[in-house]
Amino acid sequence: MGKCQVISHPLIQHKLSILRRQTTSTKDFRELVNEIAMLMGYEVSRDLPLEDVDIQTPVSKTVQKQLAGKKLAIVPILRAGIGMVDGLLSLVPAAKVGHIGMYRNEETLEPVEYLVKLPEDINQRQIFLVDPMLATGGSAILAVDSLKKRGAANIKFVCLVAAPEGVKKLQEAHPDIDIFTAALDDHLNDHGYIVPGLGDAGDRLFGPK
């Protein structure tokens, strides 16, 4: 069974508290999502493979380390996942970026996929699948399904806030997937929103649809 790791760094928790506030502006919300994603990236990328590389410093030749093989692929679930991409790219600028577009049917609460654009070599890359929220788990499960259909095997799901119901569903559907979150909240309400959560992340990042 994949792990669910809550990254409880003090800076992340402080910024997440500001992010949750109803009065936080769109500008500040966007910046905070970017900053939290970057801070989480250090932990999420902890097991990236390294290889030796010969370099010349101003003083001497030396053998040092660099990321090995194919670099990351960062795949946001549209639209809210876009807000996390730049923070992760600031750590690994060579990463490729794909997109999986989904929206939620507000009556059934089920996700509907409308776009899949991925790097051609997605099956050779470690993937950070990103979405600020893991609520019902439906979008995450469908996105992982899409990635696996295209040969992807090394996938981590990265979110800012998760509900226990969504974590359980994702782990049951894809027990090989590790989940990284800045907070594991209490529950989902009758409308499928995380409580206490932070509202509709897409609307708070980009404005109402």
UniProtKB/Swiss-Prot annotation:
<keyword id="KW-0342">GTP-binding</keyword>
<keyword id="KW-0328">Glycosyltransferase</keyword>
<dbReference type="InterPro" id="IPR050054">
    <property type="entry name" value="UPRTase/APRTase"/>
</dbReference>
<feature type="binding site">
    <location>
        <begin position="131"/>
        <end position="139"/>
    </location>
    <ligand>
        <name>5-phospho-alpha-D-ribose 1-diphosphate</name>
    </ligand>
</feature>
<feature type="binding site">
    <location>
        <position position="194"/>
    </location>
    <ligand>
        <name>uracil</name>
    </ligand>
</feature>
<dbReference type="InterPro" id="IPR034332">
    <property type="entry name" value="Upp_B"/>
</dbReference>
<feature type="binding site">
    <location>
        <position position="200"/>
    </location>
    <ligand>
        <name>5-phospho-alpha-D-ribose 1-diphosphate</name>
    </ligand>
</feature>
<dbReference type="Pfam" id="PF14681">
    <property type="entry name" value="UPRTase"/>
</dbReference>
<keyword id="KW-0547">Nucleotide-binding</keyword>
<dbReference type="GO" id="GO:0000287">
    <property type="term" value="F:magnesium ion binding"/>
</dbReference>
<keyword id="KW-0808">Transferase</keyword>
<keyword id="KW-0021">Allosteric enzyme</keyword>
<protein>
    <recommendedName>
        <fullName>Uracil phosphoribosyltransferase</fullName>
        <ecNumber>2.4.2.9</ecNumber>
    </recommendedName>
</protein>
<dbReference type="GO" id="GO:0044206">
    <property type="term" value="P:UMP salvage"/>
</dbReference>
<feature type="binding site">
    <location>
        <begin position="199"/>
        <end position="201"/>
    </location>
    <ligand>
        <name>uracil</name>
    </ligand>
</feature>
<dbReference type="GO" id="GO:0006223">
    <property type="term" value="P:uracil salvage"/>
</dbReference>
<comment type="similarity">
    <text>Belongs to the UPRTase family.</text>
</comment>
<feature type="binding site">
    <location>
        <position position="79"/>
    </location>
    <ligand>
        <name>5-phospho-alpha-D-ribose 1-diphosphate</name>
    </ligand>
</feature>
<dbReference type="InterPro" id="IPR029057">
    <property type="entry name" value="PRTase-like"/>
</dbReference>
<feature type="binding site">
    <location>
        <position position="104"/>
    </location>
    <ligand>
        <name>5-phospho-alpha-D-ribose 1-diphosphate</name>
    </ligand>
</feature>
<comment type="function">
    <text>Catalyzes the conversion of uracil and 5-phospho-alpha-D-ribose 1-diphosphate (PRPP) to UMP and diphosphate.</text>
</comment>
<dbReference type="InterPro" id="IPR000836">
    <property type="entry name" value="PRibTrfase_dom"/>
</dbReference>
<dbReference type="GO" id="GO:0005525">
    <property type="term" value="F:GTP binding"/>
</dbReference>
<dbReference type="GO" id="GO:0004845">
    <property type="term" value="F:uracil phosphoribosyltransferase activity"/>
</dbReference>
<dbReference type="InterPro" id="IPR005765">
    <property type="entry name" value="Ura_phspho_trans"/>
</dbReference>
<comment type="pathway">
    <text>Pyrimidine metabolism; UMP biosynthesis via salvage pathway; UMP from uracil: step 1/1.</text>
</comment>
<keyword id="KW-0460">Magnesium</keyword>
